[in-house]
């Protein structure tokens, strides 16, 4: 159960960075509530990490996969990316590099959402088949671990920032991020002691990928990407948010690539290297989307995605803006650390 607790901590700790630290950092640098609120959109990636879960199941990292296992290698890679992001944050000023800081925050969110895919699977593997009765206890321990990583990690983060500020350190948030890197390193040391089973599972997945590509599913996926991209583009234009507009254009380009792929297959057939490459992309991207909408229907599928997205966005904004509210009515970072984080961890 301690291994499951550690996995929960690893999963929850990145939220300290993009939910607590980033919000207060931007607030104390004098940025507006609307800017901080818009930055909360990076949490939307957690609602859609299932879209790239099939890709994660099929990726082999050179050396690492064979050395420590497939799932642990993915977690270690994502943790390394988060460390690099913290290094970048530690040398930036929000008033001068706002877009870059939010972009780095998005990279942390994507890395966190990606590692959650493998953390959940690795957590389940820690409970043996003959211990299936312990599954509920394992799920509870995972929740405890997540809240420990988020709340207790948030307490440590805010206390460090408060003490550095009181000591006269100018860029105390940037120095705080350096300290937080140490916590991530310690978590990865603990990760090395967690065993991983089912290493033959990777080859079994590849063996089932062979030739189940449906051209119509590729066309449907292209339409979906283009529709999402067009919606994001219009939202970005309406609110004058260039990074949202660029994200929409990226989705449109991805959709166009899939549509060109479907045309290529119809025109030249499937027995060539280019088609085989697109077949792989289809199996890990288009097929899961197509299966989701085929099982639920287009209307129900869109409704489910919209519900999850709106739920996560509401949760993200509430958490972020509550810290801004506490700061505006006079609470210090130390107060927030004690009453919101430490006591919140105990009660949760």
Where are the model-predicted features located?
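Intracellular loop-helix junctions on the cytosolic face of multi-pass helical membrane proteins
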Residues: 90-102, 114, 126-310, 333
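Central cavity-lining transmembrane alpha-helices of secondary-active solute carriers
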Residues: 35-62, 82, 342-348
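Substrate-agnostic recognition of the 12-TM MFS/MFS-like secondary transporter fold
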Residues: 7-8, 15, 42, 46-49, ...
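Helix-loop boundary and gating motifs at the non-cytosolic
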Residues: 1-46, 107, 232-236, 300-325, ...
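Hydrophobic/aromatic positions within or immediately flanking transmembrane alpha-helices
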Residues: 37, 75-76, 102, 174-178, ...
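C-terminal ends and interior cores of transmembrane alpha-helices
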Residues: 61-62, 73-96
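Residue-level recognition of pore/gate-forming positions within transmembrane alpha-helices
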Residues: 43, 79-83, 181-185, 255-259, ...
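Interfacial helix-cap and linker-helix signal at transmembrane-aqueous boundaries
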Residues: 26-27, 56, 60, 156-165, ...
């Amino acid at each position: 159960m301690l291994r499951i607790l550690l996995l929960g901590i690893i999963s929850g700790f990145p939220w300290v960075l993009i939910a607590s630290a980033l919000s207060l950092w931007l607030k104390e640098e004098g940025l507006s509530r609307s800017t901080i609120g818009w930055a909360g959109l990076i949490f939307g990636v957690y609602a859609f990490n299932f879209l790239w879960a099939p890709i994660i199941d099929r990726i082999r990292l050179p050396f690492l996969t064979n050395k420590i296992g497939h799932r642990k290698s993915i977690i270690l890679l994502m943790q390394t990316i988060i460390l690099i992001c913290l290094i970048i944050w530690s040398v930036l000023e929000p008033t001068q590099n706002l877009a870059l800081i939010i972009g780095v925050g998005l990279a942390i969110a994507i890395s966190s959402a990606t590692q959650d895919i493998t953390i959940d699977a690795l957590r389940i593997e820690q409970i043996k088949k003959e211990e299936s009765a312990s599954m509920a206890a394992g799920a509870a321990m995972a929740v405890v671990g997540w809240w420990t990583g988020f709340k207790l990690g948030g307490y440590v983060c805010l206390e460090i920032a408060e003490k550095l500020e009181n000591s006269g350190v100018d860029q105390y948030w940037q120095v705080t991020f350096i300290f937080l890197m140490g916590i991530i390193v310690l978590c990865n040391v603990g990760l090395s002691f967690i065993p991983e089973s089912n290493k033959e599972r990777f080859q079994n997945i590849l063996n089932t990928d062979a030739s189940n590509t449906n051209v119509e599913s590729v066309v449907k996926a292209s339409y979906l990407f283009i529709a999402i991209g067009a919606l994001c583009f219009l939202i970005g234009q309406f609110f004058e948010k260039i990074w949202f507009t660029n994200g929409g254009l990226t989705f449109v380009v991805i959709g166009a690539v899939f549509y060109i792929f479907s045309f290529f297959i119809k025109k030249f057939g499937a027995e060539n290297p280019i088609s085989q490459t697109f077949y792989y992309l289809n199996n890990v991207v288009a097929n899961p989307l197509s299966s989701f909408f085929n099982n639920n229907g287009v209307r129900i599928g869109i409704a489910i995605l919209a519900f999850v997205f709106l739920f996560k966005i509401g949760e993200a904004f509430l958490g972020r803006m509550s810290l801004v509210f506490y700061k505006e009515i006079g609470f210090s970072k130390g107060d927030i650390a004690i009453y919101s984080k430490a006591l919140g961890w105990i009660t949760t």
